[in-house]
C-alpha cells in the first residue's frame, strides 16, 4: 500500500464525511412540516437554542420601503450602503449586551434577508426575519396574489419559505409577520390571519400581528382561536397603542403576548406604567418590550442618516431598564422582560388548542 494510495483514500473519506454531515444538516432544516426545527429559534444564520438568544429586542427594523408592493424592489437601494449605515447601530446595541434582534420588515416592505445575514455575521447578533404579508394601510403593501388566492394557498406559500428557505437564499424565516387594518376586519384581513394560523400549525412559527387598536386586536385573537391555534403563539404588535389598559390585560390573560414596542426617550414613563399594570395583574410573563426603531428608509438620502431620522436601538438599555429599576422591578423581573420572554415568544413549536 503506497503513500499516494493512502492519501487518495483519506481524501475520499473526507469528502464522504463532509457530505454525510451536510446531509444531516439538510435533514434538520427541511423535513415533513419542518418538525425537525421545533424548540429552536430560527435566525438568518440558522437555528439556535432559545437559551442562546440572550437580551433581545422583539420588534425592530433594519430596512423599510414604504413605496408600495407594486413598486418596491432591491433595485431601489444599495445593499452595501444599507449594511454600512446600519452596522454601527447594531454594534451600539451589542456593546450594551444585547444579542437578539427581531427584524419585522415583511416581504414587499423591503425584507432583505441577505442584508440581515451580512449584518448578523459582522456583529454576532442573532437576527430573525419573517414570512407572511402585511395588510395594514388598506393593502398598499400587499401583492396582487394575496387578493386572488385563498388562505390555504397563502399558507402554502409561507410554509414553503419555512421548508425550502426564502427565495433561494438558504435563509429561513423565524416567525410569521402580518398586519391588519384598525377597527372591524375586512375580508382580506381575516384571510391573512387565517393563513397565518394555518402556517403556524404546519411550521410552529410564532405569529406577530400589527394591530395597535383594541377592536382589531381582539378580532385577530378570536380568529386564531377559531383556527385551533393556542393564543400563546400570537404577538399583538403595537399593544401600547391600545387605549384601554383593561384590553391589554384581557389579551394577555387569554395567553397572547402583549408587545409594548413604542419605547423611546419620550415614552419611558408611559411604558413603565404599562409594564407595571401588566405586572400587577400577574401578566409580566406575557409582556414583550421593544422600540420599533431604526431604520434605513428607502428614498431618503443615505436612508435618513443625513437628516438624523434613523433612531438607535438603545432606548431600552439606556433609559427603560434604569427606569424600571427605579420603579421597583427586580433584576429577575427585568430579565424576564428582556431575556426570557423574547426567547419563549420566538421558540418554534406548534401550539394547538
What are these regions (language model features)?
Residues 66-70, 113, 139, 216-223, ...:
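Histidine/acidic-residue-rich catalytic or RNA/ligand-binding cores of hydrolases
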Residues 54-58, 71-126, 152-171:
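Alpha-helical scaffold segments that flank or form the walls of functional sites
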Residues 165-243:
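Divalent metal-binding pocket/active-site signature
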Residues 118-121, 126-128, 132-201, 257, ...:
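Active-site gating/metal-coordination segments in enzymes
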Residues 208, 261-262, 283-307, 334:
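Short acidic/histidine-rich active-site segments
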Residues 2-6, 17, 39-45, 314-353:
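Mid-to-C-terminal alpha-helical segments outside catalytic/metal-binding sites
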